[in-house]
């Protein structure tokens, strides 16, 4: 099949429609011949096509036609285009509307684009009546009437026949088409002789109801039947037009309907393009519950007998396989035989006679039950990233469930509580070969961005790894017993006693080094905990092995160690009983007594405070402060429990070192003091969205407590532990949280899935080019992919070593640090980076040596400097900054830290060049990789409890998915959270006083109203000065609040005001008022709204506290800073303040408006990264890539839009935009087939690599070189001859 490089869209012309010879002329018929269900329109439901005789898999259908008897029917989707054209011509004479007469001898093709635009403006500028002296009629405005379903004259609502419009449009001369932006013959906007009937394939029969009668058909078929019926009756133009519109897009004439039509099935997320072409249901698939198996490796998947006997795989007949196929036929193992010459598939059954069908010629194939070791794709949904779908070798296993190795459970996000997985057996040999390499677990061992292994030990294996390392005094037989089948090659080296460390050294099997962890393949760490054996850890032994050698060794270690850990457990056993958790009741009784005592003290103190407030002895705190103090007391109680449990664990470890529960804690598996607190101590405060449950009827959550009770237990503090059990009310509070979480999970799954799909669609065509740059189409996004031009799975986070005077080359390192340090102080100077990105894990090649054997200090510096200069020029073309790489090598290989030999240094830099040369291939789909990693992580977060909000000063800054969603949607005209940071608190206080909302009611005023005296009302407002001070305002501000409210009040006619100091604690504001009529009513209104309406600042439910924190200027320079967050629409509101030396951190749109697109990109990148929280620094690269794409043009663009990136028509159509194909056809667009979506449609391999280079030879270049060389040799020979002649 020829490779299609370009596609052009256009409208069907009438000749193409008329060319089909399948005429549809009946509404009903006994055998459906001549109806819209005619068998000649394609194969359906197992029946062969009556036109081509093929099955529904091979026949793509045939078009029919129904006569419309010379009626002109408008193609419904182009009604607006016809109205646009009619606005440019006179409906009477058909000439172009113009202010002045124009000549028809203009050659528009010779005009430049600018000249054409000027002519267009001149000719098409409007005038009221036609310039044609033979017409002179006023121009008519033509519109389409939804009610009459035809074109009408807007002035008098008189029908304008389609035939008249047709004649006027086709009479426009072709030379004027560029002026009117007509791209093809206007007749194509109409159906004239025949209307096309689409093939059966797009309208499969389904059951639905019409007028309470069940129909076994398709709604499109039903609508087509109505068109045929009206055409047979030779109905009016409007009747046929209406039937065609109902079939095409009913929304053109009716807004409140949702019936299925062509527009409906090609738009939205259930469009046919997405459901039947981009992805569809497949044969040779299976689905079952999954379970673990200890007998299969990471590279295998266990398949039960019933799936093996159902799925079949093809064996193609050729010279190599013909004998095998004959054997299979003889042994009755063949299920199907396909004869290519006869184009016939034969099912082979026991005892069935087959005559002249089996020829076994090349190209034929047989289907047999799937065999062991065949590669099969399997995965668990939701498939959030590529580690959820892998291709492994089939193994036969017992039982009825699919078996997977526990080592891959993490990457599949699978547990064994009823999870299901699907599997598909690909039939194409090319697909099988491709999947068996690119989707094989060994290939996928290391995470694309994180760089750590995605496979590793789970559950009991972690404890086994810990216990095995600690075991001592093993004899050889015991070692060989633990090693099992892997013990054959174990070399005792003359020793009689062995430890767990020796077993690990044997399993590692390589002379590998790593600072503080490995020395010559031997573990030098104190313990082996979960960090060494589980997935997604940078210290994973499997990861270090694969960094040192290859993924094969890494996977091999996982397989061997998993087997050994399981054997260790089966020999020595491991179990946790309730006795391990709670040897006796002494400790839990003690904890319970402490908890009861403390909660009573808290309640007592709280009750005393409430009584004192009621009696007027003290001034009450604000509600927020009161809640904070209560919460802080309860948190102290929780922390007390944790401290007691930590002490208990420490003591138990001394008394009972073999306690299995504590072994788990030490191994880093499952057990931590907080979880033990729930079981043994207290279940703690239950929260919904980060807050205690809100009170409801009678000021309480549950009827277990008195109305308006302030009891902390009545707001969800559960005192009991799970060991003691929960009371009725406590159980209710725990279920309240469970209910809100389950609801959140249901909703968030949908939201995260939607955004994930949008991000992948946005980033899918972003690839690495041959120079290691990131491009999308012809647009350059990043100069250096992954910053290092090395595959993301090869890059490695390493410790960031800060400059120190004890270092060799201190001055050079300091100078480099000063150039790059800005990138390591981030998040408004609150955080200092502890890690940085190394181009590869060179630390596994660092072998310490003695001073005598070490490379000279100057030689090592020169080597590092020369390598970096060479790489900067040859690989990064001096365009990208790679100072960070030089800094890493200078600090980590610093002679003051470690001495290495010259050979070690050469090895490290040879590996560096190797990674630069061979890991990151042109075409690597870095966009899809980044999009999947981002999406997988925010989905996991949204489904965990991470999306609770965090109080960041005043405004609750949303964390997690919500904020990420807002950032990528980039909504304009919304308030943004502005952060102000300064070391001078007074500058922030002036902003706070102006913006913080304070109303009179918050100051707990004492109102008193005197009767009307001397024709005026007197209102006394007495406020305690303590409340004014607590609100951080002054008496003058309170006076201003009252004055401002009264002066703007429309119900006050006249007013006056006096301020008095009542006593040392109180101040009195006396207001004199006259109201407009009706006075009594307005007085009541005034008194009612006074507490809330007399206010200052921006109305908000949040306060604006100023918090202090330690800010970093450098790793060794900190200072006290004050921070305040405020919600503003625009930074102009800050214009009247003195903000000198105040750092203002605006939102994304304010950043863009002030500093431009590059600053917006940096803001977006950091803001998106911050939504993930701690420990996700490795997501910086995908966040940066997404931010760079959103800011690739002059203005930030939402993930929902493709305004700047030239998204192809097929990509838009796949995305659910059914207008994309219509517009492309109307404008006769031509587009290259480059992007993923377009390649999918035209069976073209997308321009995406696999991380490997494609090598090719440019023969033309060789020929040119050959000519140059021959010319050079010729000239050299002539020169030599001339010199000889001279002698």
UniProtKB/Swiss-Prot annotation:
Keywords: DNA-directed RNA polymerase, Nucleotidyltransferase, Transcription, Transferase, Virion. It comes from the Viruses. GO terms for biological process: DNA-templated transcription; DNA-templated viral transcription. SUPFAM superfamilies: beta and beta-prime subunits of DNA dependent RNA-polymerase. It catalyses: RNA(n) + a ribonucleoside 5'-triphosphate = RNA(n+1) + diphosphate. One of its GO terms (cellular component) is virion component. The keyword Membrane does not apply. It is found in: Virion. It is an enzyme of class 2 (transferase). Pfam families: RNA_pol_Rpb1_1 (PF04997), RNA_pol_Rpb1_2 (PF00623), RNA_pol_Rpb1_3 (PF04983), RNA_pol_Rpb1_4 (PF05000), RNA_pol_Rpb1_5 (PF04998). The DNA-dependent RNA polymerase used for intermediate and late genes expression consists of eight subunits Rpo30/OPG66, Rpo7/OPG90, Rpo22/OPG103, Rpo147/OPG105, Rpo18/OPG119, Rpo19/OPG131, Rpo132/OPG151 and Rpo35/OPG156. The same holoenzyme, with the addition of the transcription-specificity factor OPG109, is used for early gene expression. Part of the DNA-dependent RNA polymerase which catalyzes the transcription of viral DNA into RNA using the four ribonucleoside triphosphates as substrates. Responsible for the transcription of early, intermediate and late genes. DNA-dependent RNA polymerase associates with the early transcription factor (ETF), itself composed of OPG118 and OPG133, thereby allowing the early genes transcription. Late transcription, and probably also intermediate transcription, require newly synthesized RNA polymerase. Belongs to the poxviridae DNA-directed RNA polymerase 147 kDa subunit family. This is DNA-directed RNA polymerase 147 kDa polypeptide.
């Amino acid at each position: 099949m020829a490779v299609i490089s370009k596609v052009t869209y256009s409208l069907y012309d009438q000749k193409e429609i008329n060319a089909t010879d399948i005429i549809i002329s009946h509404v009903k018929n006994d055998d459906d011949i001549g109806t819209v269900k005619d068998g000649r329109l394609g194969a359906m439901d197992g029946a062969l096509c009556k036109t081509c005789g093929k099955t529904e898999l091979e026949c793509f259908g045939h078009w029919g036609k129904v006569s419309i008897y010379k009626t002109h029917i408008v193609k419904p989707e182009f009604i607006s285009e016809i109205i646009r054209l009619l606005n440019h011509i006179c409906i009477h004479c058909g000439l172009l509307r113009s202010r002045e007469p124009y000549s028809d001898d203009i050659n528009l093709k010779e005009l430049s684009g600018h000249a054409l635009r000027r002519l267009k403006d001149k000719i098409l500028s409007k005038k009221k009546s036609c310039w044609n002296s033979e017409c002179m009629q006023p121009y008519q405005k033509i519109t389409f009437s939804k009610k009459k379903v035809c074109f009408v004259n807007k002035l008098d609502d008189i029908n304008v026949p389609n035939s008249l419009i047709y004649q006027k449009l086709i009479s426009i001369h072709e030379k004027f088409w560029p002026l009117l932006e007509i791209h093809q013959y206007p007749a194509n906007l109409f159906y004239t002789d025949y209307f096309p009937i689409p093939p059966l394939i797009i309208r499969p029969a389904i059951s639905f109801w019409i007028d309470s009668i069940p129909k076994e058909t398709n709604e499109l078929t039903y609508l087509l039947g109505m068109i045929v019926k009206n055409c047979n009756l030779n109905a009016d133009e409007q009747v046929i037009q209406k039937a065609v519109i109902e079939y095409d897009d009913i929304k053109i004439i009716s807004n409140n309907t949702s019936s299925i039509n062509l527009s409906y099935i090609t738009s939205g997320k259930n469009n046919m393009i997405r459901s039947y072409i981009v992805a569809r249901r497949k044969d040779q698939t299976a689905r079952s519950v999954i379970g673990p198996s200890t007998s299969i490796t990471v590279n295998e998947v266990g398949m039960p007998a019933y799936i093996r006997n159902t799925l079949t795989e093809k064996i193609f007949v050729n010279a190599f396989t013909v004998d095998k196929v004959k054997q299979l036929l003889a042994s009755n193992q063949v299920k199907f035989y396909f004869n290519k010459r006869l184009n016939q598939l034969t099912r082979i059954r026991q005892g069935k006679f087959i005559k002249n069908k089996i020829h076994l010629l090349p190209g034929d194939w047989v289907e047999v039950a799937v065999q062991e070791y065949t590669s099969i794709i399997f995965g668990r949904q939701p498939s959030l990233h590529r580690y959820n779908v892998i291709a492994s070798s089939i193994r036969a296993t017992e039982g009825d469930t699919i078996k997977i190795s526990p080592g891959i459970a993490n990457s599949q996000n699978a547990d064994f509580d009823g999870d299901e997985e699907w599997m598909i057996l690909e039939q194409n040999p090319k697909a099988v070969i491709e999947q068996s390499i690119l989707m094989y677990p060994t290939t996928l061992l290391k995470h694309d961005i994180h760089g750590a292994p995605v496979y590793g030990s789970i559950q009991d294996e972690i404890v086994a790894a810990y216990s095995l390392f600690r075991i001592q005094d093993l004899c050889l037989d015991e070692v060989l017993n633990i090693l099992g089948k892997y013990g054959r090659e174990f070399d005792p080296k003359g020793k009689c006693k062995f430890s767990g460390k020796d077993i690990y050294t044997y399993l590692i099997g390589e002379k590998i080094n790593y600072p503080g962890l490995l020395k010559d393949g031997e573990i030098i760490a104190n313990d082996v905990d979960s960090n060494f054996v589980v997935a997604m850890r940078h210290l994973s032994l499997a990861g270090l092995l694969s960094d040192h050698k290859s993924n094969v060794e890494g996977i091999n270690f996982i397989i061997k160690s998993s087997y050994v850990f399981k054997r260790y457990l089966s020999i020595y056993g491991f179990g946790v009983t309730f006795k391990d958790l709670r040897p006796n009741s002494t400790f839990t009784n003690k904890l319970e007594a402490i908890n009861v005592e403390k909660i009573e003290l808290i309640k007592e103190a709280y009750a005393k405070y409430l009584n004192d407030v009621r009696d007027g002895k003290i001034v009450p705190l604000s509600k927020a402060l009161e809640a904070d103090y209560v919460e802080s007391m309860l948190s102290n109680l929780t922390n007390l429990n944790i401290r007691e449990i930590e002490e208990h664990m420490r003591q138990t470890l001394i008394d009972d070192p073999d306690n299995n529960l504590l072994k788990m804690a030490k191994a880093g598996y499952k057990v931590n003091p907080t979880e033990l607190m729930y079981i043994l101590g207290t279940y703690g405060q239950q929260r919904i969205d980060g807050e205690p449950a809100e009170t409801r009827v009678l000021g309480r959550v549950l009827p277990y407590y008195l109305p308006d009770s302030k009891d902390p237990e009545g707001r969800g503090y559960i005192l009991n532990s799970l060991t003691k059990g929960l009371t009725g009310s406590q159980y209710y509070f725990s279920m309240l949280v469970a209910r809100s979480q389950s609801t959140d999970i249901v909703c968030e799954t949908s939201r995260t899935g939607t955004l994930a799909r949008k991000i992948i669609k946005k980033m899918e065509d972003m690839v690495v080019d041959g120079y290691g740059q990131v491009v999308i189409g012809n647009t350059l996004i990043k100069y250096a992919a992954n910053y290092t031009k090395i595959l993301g799975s090869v890059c490695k986070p390493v410790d960031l070593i800060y400059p120190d005077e004890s270092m060799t080359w201190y001055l050079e390192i300091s100078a480099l640090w000063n150039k790059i340090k800005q990138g390591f102080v981030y998040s408004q100077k609150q955080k200092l980076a502890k890690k940085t990105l190394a181009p590869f894990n060179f630390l596994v090649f660092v072998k310490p040596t003695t001073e005598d054997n070490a490379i000279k200090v100057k030689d090592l510096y020169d080597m590092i400097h020369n390598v970096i200069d060479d790489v900067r020029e040859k690989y990064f073309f001096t365009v990208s900054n790679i100072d960070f790489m030089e800094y890493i090598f200078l600090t980590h290989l610093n002679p003051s830290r470690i001495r290495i030999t010259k050979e070690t240094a050469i090895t490290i830099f040879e590996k560096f060049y190797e990674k630069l040369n061979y890991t990151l291939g042109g075409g690597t789909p870095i966009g899809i990789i980044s999009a999947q990693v981002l999406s997988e992580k925010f989905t996991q977060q949204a489904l965990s409890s991470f999306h609770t909000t965090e109080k960041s000063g005043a405004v609750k800054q949303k964390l997690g998915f919500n904020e990420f969603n807002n950032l990528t949607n980039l909504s304009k005209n919304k308030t943004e959270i502005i952060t102000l940071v300064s070391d001078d608190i007074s500058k922030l206080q002036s902003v706070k006083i102006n913006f913080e909302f304070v109303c009179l009611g918050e100051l707990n005023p004492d109102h008193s109203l005197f009767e009307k005296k001397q024709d005026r009302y007197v209102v006394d407002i007495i406020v305690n000065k303590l409340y004014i001070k607590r609100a951080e305002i002054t008496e003058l501000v309170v006076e201003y609040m009252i004055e401002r409210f009264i002066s703007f009040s429309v119900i006050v006619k006249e007013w006056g005001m006096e301020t008095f100091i009542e006593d040392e604690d109180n101040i009195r504001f006396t207001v004199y008022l006259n109201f407009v009529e009706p006075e009594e009513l307005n007085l009541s209104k005034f008194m009612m709204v006074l507490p809330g309406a007399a206010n200052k600042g921006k109305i908000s439910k949040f306060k604006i506290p100023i918090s202090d924190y330690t800010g970093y200027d450098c790793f060794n320079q900190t200072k006290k800073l004050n921070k305040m967050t405020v919600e503003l629409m625009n930074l102009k509101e800050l214009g009247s303040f003195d903000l000198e030396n105040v750092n203002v951190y605006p939102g994304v749109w304010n950043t863009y408006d002030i500093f431009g697109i590059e600053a917006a990109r940096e803001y977006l990148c950091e803001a998106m990264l911050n939504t993930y929280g701690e420990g996700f620094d490795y997501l910086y690269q995908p966040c940066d890539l997404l931010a760079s794409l959103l800011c690739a043009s002059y203005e930030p663009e939402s993930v929902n839009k493709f305004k700047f990136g030239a998204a192809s028509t097929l990509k838009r159509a796949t995305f659910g935009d059914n207008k994309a194909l219509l517009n492309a056809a109307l404008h006769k667009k031509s587009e290259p087939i480059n992007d993923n979506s377009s390649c999918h449609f035209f069976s073209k391999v997308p321009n995406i690599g696999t991380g490997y280079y494609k090598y090719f030879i440019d023969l033309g270049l060789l020929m040119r070189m050959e000519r140059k060389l021959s010319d050079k040799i010729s000239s050299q020979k002539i020169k030599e001859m001339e010199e000889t002649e001279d002698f």
